[in-house]
Amino acid sequence: MSSTQQFLVIGGLVLLSLLALNFYRASDIQYNMKYENEATITATSIAQSTFEEMSTKAFDEVTTDWKTDSQDSLTLTASFGPDSAETTRTLFDDIDDYHGYYFVDSTMNLGKFNVSIIINYVVPSNPNTISSTRTFTKKATIFINNSYLKNQLQYIYAYSY
């Protein structure tokens, strides 16, 4: 085999190697995107079901048994979180019991989803603004992490009384 033929064979092998590398790189990117998309859909499902669960609870501890017209009677932000008798999520009776709540959902096929919840009073006309005083609008923010997600996902829902 002449040196020209050897160069052509080597050049062909190099091109074939580059083609194979690009194929595997593209396949890897596709798989990563597939798993990230599936994890995003699963996280959204977890957040949605948690928001729906929260919507079945009373707006505030004082509204579990009666109505109120006074914002001053609502729970102080510093007192958000479960009461001492509310040791599990099934015992929560109002929205702010979920404040600071953390749980791991591993029922799906992509491993563990770490979920944490923060509750704040917000300005009713602008739910993106946290209120320093008690209002008749609370914002629930759910943060979800998973090993297939590049970034922590954040879901927000506002509840009004």
Predicted regions located by residue number:
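Aliphatic-rich helix starts adjacent to a transmembrane/signal segment
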Residues: 3-48
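Low-complexity, Gly/Pro-rich coil/beta segments used as flexible assembly/activation regions
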Residues: 41-161
